[in-house]
UniProtKB/Swiss-Prot annotation:
The keyword Lipid biosynthesis does not apply. Keywords: Cell membrane, GTP-binding, Hydrolase, Membrane, Nucleotide-binding, Protein biosynthesis. The gene is lepA. It catalyses: GTP + H2O = GDP + phosphate + H(+). This is Elongation factor 4. HAMAP family: LepA. It comes from Corynebacterium efficiens (strain DSM 44549 / YS-314 / AJ 12310 / JCM 11189 / NBRC 100395). NCBIfam families: lepA (TIGR01393), small_GTP (TIGR00231). It is an enzyme of class 3 (hydrolase). Its main location: membrane. SUPFAM superfamilies: EF-G C-terminal domain-like, P-loop containing nucleoside triphosphate hydrolases, Translation proteins. The keyword Cell membrane applies. GTP binds at D26, H27, G28, K29, S30, T31, N147, K148, I149, D150. Its EC number is 3.6.5.n1. Pfam families: EFG_C (PF00679), GTP_EFTU (PF00009), GTP_EFTU_D2 (PF03144), LepA_C (PF06421).
Length: 615
């Protein structure tokens, strides 16, 4: 069987091609990967299933790739200068979503080239552009490809021109394939072999090993499986290895390749991609972007570009029934084994009881984590409104980091800084007006705009992250009939005039409803929450005021009218003073009740107030 040559490692680097596929959600990346797996015969026809590389249910259901995957494939080109030679291709499948940009950048670092995959019926999207620029910064060879040319709505000529303008190539150089039918895929693989450079062999055979971690997953039986790309030197089983960011040393229990199921091998040489297992049980020990080297006589310098993942968005997660709290803690621990960028700390809320304050990379990450908790661990959760990380300086010059409204310092504050992001939006040209209005309403500052083609425009804004995390994306979609695409990346911080709005029930603040908003939006938030709660909280025997306050100043108020019994029903005719006496008596009773009565907010009211359109 000629195809088995890819299973031998220590391949000569000149016969290796490492590449990844950059594409937007739904542009057919996983389908194309399926075709490539079939063509190279690494998956038997009987084992084939759609979206072969997306293993999590949630990945298949939403049609997105969350964890990077990698596969080692044999390929014998049928055309071009390498015709008939045995080439080993290593395909790294990257997440396409903006929240996972750092993971994408590490996966790109592990490749020498990238296939830019664009749907021939939709054209390029903002997040694809962001990843494309990332690939160009890493000096990768880009192969532009239009997918889904079998669709009746496809317009390959129009979009080939658009891609050619962005990448800087000729429109006829843009390859056309169909991942579904397999048309053009063999030619694409031949082009990969021809155009993508081979990895560099490193300084010498016996140079100290340096390998970059681009992903790690937790396996119940074997502990953490770390995916690496060897840059120079060799790694073999039973060696002692060292992680350069933490200095921790481990013994290499097993090393191997993924083709597409894990297979043990004798070791990995320069340019090769594979996995290693050290028996460690905690994913945080093998960090994405870290450098692996020998523990003895290892490399001095780590590879460039390692960063600690920093949470951008915070939200409180509380179990609907308090009995589930230990289960939620166990579930978060298990998720963290697989997702090192998730952070959490215990939090108590007067209104919602015990829960956790969790930090996420972005909105999609938050949604997916919540989905997985509910689906895989069968938990019912309430999540509080998302917030970001603020830097607050008080009158005494003390600096505080605040990502929870209940930690907001009281008293006068000297300066408040909020995180800002660079936003790129691609919209059809007829929606430019409404999109710009929306961005300005969300305190955006325009950075510039470019026409990608005559009917598609790229808008660039600097915006506060706090304005985006509520419902910006939904509003953008509704104003552009669903055609807009959005990408954002961190851009530091700016000073802002922010205040904390408290919601008071009968004069008592309810911590779950507090929010940090811009002073101009405080009135709007206060009105919105008081009106919403008025309709959600059941009427009591006495009148209940719902107020919104900034500090000690009340900015909005709604009253829940009291339920009252008709005390005059038994009086037929009769004297007015008799009626007045009964009414006065009722009034005094209500007043006494109001002093001692407390308002129970039903659980459903919390869920409805926190989960429906948050802005």
């Amino acid at each position: 069987m000629a195809e088995k040559f890819a299973e031998k490692t220590f391949t000569d680097p000149s016969r290796i091609r490492n590449f990844c596929i950059i594409a937007h959600i739904d542009h057919g990346k996983s389908t194309l990967a399926d075709r490539i797996l079939q063509l190279s015969n690494v998956v038997d026809a009987r084992d084939m299933r759609a979206q072969y590389l997306d293993n999590m249910d949630i990945e298949r259901e939403r049609g997105i790739t969350i964890k990077a995957q990698n596969v080692r494939l044999p390929w014998i080109p049928r055309s071009g200068e390498y015709e008939g030679q045995e080439i080993v291709m290593q395909m790294i499948d990257t997440p396409g979503h903006v929240d996972f940009t750092y993971e994408v950048s590490r996966a790109l670092e592990a490749c020498e080239g990238a296939i830019l995959l664009v749907d021939a019926a939709q054209g390029i999207e903002a997040q694809t552009l962001a990843n494309l620029y990332l690939a160009m910064e890493n000096d990768l060879e880009i192969i532009p490809v239009l997918n889904k040319i079998d669709l009746p709505a496809a317009d390959p000529d129009k979009y080939a021109l658009e891609i050619a303008n962005i990448v800087g190539c000729e429109p006829e150089d843009v390859l056309r394939v169909s991942g579904k039918t397999g048309v053009g895929v063999p030619e694409l693989l031949d082009k990969v072999v021809e155009l993508i450079p081979a990895p560099s062999p490193g300084p010498s055979e016996d140079a100290p090993a340096r390998a970059m971690i681009f992903d790690s997953v937790y396996d119940t039986y074997r502990g953490v499986v770390t995916y690496i790309r060897v840059m120079e030197g060799r790694l073999t089983p039973r060696q002692k290895i060292k992680m350069m960011s933490t200095g921790a040393t481990h013994e290499l229990l097993e090393i191997g390749i993924v083709s597409p199921t894990p297979k043990k091998c004798e070791g990995l040489g320069p340019g090769e991609v594979g996995y290693l297992i050290t028996g460690v049980k905690d994913v945080r020990q093998s960090k994405v972007g870290d450098t692996v080297t020998w523990a003895h006589n290892g490399a001095e310098e780590p590879l460039q570009g390692y960063q600690e993942p920093t949470p951008m968005v915070y939200s409180g997660l509380f179990p609907v029934s308090q009995a589930d709290f230990p289960d939620l803690r166990d579930a978060l621990e298990k998720l963290q084994l697989n997702d090192a960028s998730l952070t959490y700390e215990p939090e108590t809320s007067v209104a919602l009881g015990f829960g956790f304050r969790c930090g996420f990379l972005g909105l999609l990450h938050m949604e997916i984590t919540r989905d997985r908790l509910e689906r895989e661990f069968d938990l019912d959760l309430i999540s509080t409104a998302p917030s970001v990380n603020y830097r607050v300086v008080d009158e005494a010059g003390q600096e505080h980091r605040v990502h929870n409204p209940s930690d907001w310092p009281g008293g006068k504050l000297r300066e408040i800084y909020e995180p800002i992001v660079k936003v790129t939006i691609i919209v059809p040209s007829e929606f430019v007006g409404p999109t710009m209005e929306l961005c300005q309403a969300k305190r955006g500052q325009m950075g510039g705009m470019d026409y990608l083609s005559e009917d598609r425009v790229e808008l660039r804004y600097i915006m506060p992250l706090g304005e985006i995390i509520f419902d910006f994306f939904d509003m953008l979609k509704s104003r552009t009939k669903g055609y807009a695409s959005l990408n954002y990346e961190e851009a530091g911080e700016q000073e802002a005039d922010l205040v904390k709005v408290d919601i008071l029930l009968q004069g008592e603040p309810v911590d779950a409803f507090s929010a940090i908003v811009h002073r101009d939006n405080a009135q709007w938030y206060g009105n919105k929450m008081t009106v919403k709660l008025k309709s959600l909280i059941p009427r009591q025997q006495f009148e209940v005021p719902i107020q919104a306050a900034v500090g000690s100043r009340i900015i909005a108020r709604e009253n829940i009218r009291a339920l009252r019994k008709d005390v005059l029903a038994k009086c037929y005719g009769g004297d007015i003073s008799r009626k007045r006496k009964l009414l006065e008596k009722q009034k005094a009773g209500k007043k006494r009740m109001k002093n001692i009565g407390s308002v129970e907010v039903p659980q459903e009211a919390f869920v409805a107030a926190l989960s429906t359109d948050e802005g």
